[in-house]
């Protein structure tokens, strides 16, 4: 996943089209979520997908659809080459991460991680709704105001 994250971060910075850059950012966030999920941070991986890919990427695409950005592609390399390159490098990246780790695989780990995931989710939920209730309400109000502001800009 490190190779995919590196390539997608370079492409997110280097591509001229903002929509293509957002797609590369989505790939970057999904690969980070997969890395977190595979390392045992189940809740953080799920939250990366929900928050970054779900909310921020949709908000960016909504803002980019409001802007009329015209760009002229002057490069000699076609974007299809980057896509083919990434597709060809995915098996190398996955085999690089699993090479040498297969001997230490614990078969009971997935079952234990499901039990830990429930405990982790319960802990985070109880903390968010008891100790951090006021900041959660403020974050909700900020999100509502940003949605209302985005709707007001479009009209």
Curated annotation (Swiss-Prot):
Transmembrane region(s): 10-30, 43-63, 75-95, 133-153
GO molecular function annotation: NADH dehydrogenase (ubiquinone) activity
Gene3D superfamilies (alphabetical): NADH-ubiquinone/plastoquinone oxidoreductase chain 6, subunit NuoJ (1.20.120.1200)
Coiled coil: none
Source taxon at top rank: Eukaryota
Subcellular location: Mitochondrion membrane
Pfam family, one: Oxidored_q3
EC numbers on record: 7.1.1.2
Topology within the bilayer: Multi-pass membrane protein
GO cellular component: mitochondrial membrane
Keywords, comma-separated and alphabetical: Electron transport, Membrane, Mitochondrion, NAD, Respiratory chain, Translocase, Transmembrane, Transmembrane helix, Transport, Ubiquinone
Catalytic reaction equation(s): a ubiquinone + NADH + 5 H(+)(in) = a ubiquinol + NAD(+) + 4 H(+)(out)
Keyword Transmembrane: yes
Record function comment: Core subunit of the mitochondrial membrane respiratory chain NADH dehydrogenase (Complex I) that is believed to belong to the minimal assembly required for catalysis. Complex I functions in the transfer of electrons from NADH to the respiratory chain. The immediate electron acceptor for the enzyme is believed to be ubiquinone.
Entry similarity comment: Belongs to the complex I subunit 6 family.
Protein name: NADH-ubiquinone oxidoreductase chain 6
């Amino acid at each position: 996943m490190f190779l995919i994250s590196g390539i997608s971060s370079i492409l997110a910075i280097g591509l001229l089209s903002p929509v293509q850059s957002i797609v590369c950012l989505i790939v970057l966030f999904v690969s980070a979520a997969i890395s977190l999920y595979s390392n045992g941070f189940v809740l953080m991986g799920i939250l990366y997908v929900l928050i970054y890919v779900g909310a921020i990427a949709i908000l960016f695409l909504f803002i980019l659809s409001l802007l009329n950005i015209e760009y002229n592609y002057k490069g000699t390399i076609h974007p299809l080459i980057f896509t083919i390159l990434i597709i060809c490098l995915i098996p190398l990246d996955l085999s690089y991460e699993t090479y040498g780790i297969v001997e230490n695989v614990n078969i009971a780990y997935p079952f234990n991680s499901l039990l830990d995931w429930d405990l982790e989710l319960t802990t985070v939920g109880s903390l968010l709704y008891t100790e951090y209730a006021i900041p959660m309400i403020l974050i909700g109000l900020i999100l509502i105001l940003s949605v209302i502001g985005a709707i007001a800009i479009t009209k």
